[in-house]
């Protein structure tokens, strides 16, 4: 299963990466984005898995795009749709 493979890969690197790029967002962000857009939130297995990663993983910035917007949701989560975001300048000052 892909999620188990992901966990095993992250175990090998001590749960530390520079950046995360996914289509979907972790559950808490997904729920807020659905609410803001007047959509029903249906929390699914992938969103819960991404929430697990978000809680455990050390990273500089997380980029996702499912919700068709362009904004920083907080200091490490960037919704990307049309913007071009140079990764070198992403989340300046954030550390893992």
Tell what function each PLM region has.
Residues 1-96:
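Extended recognition/assembly regions associated with phosphoester-bond processing machinery
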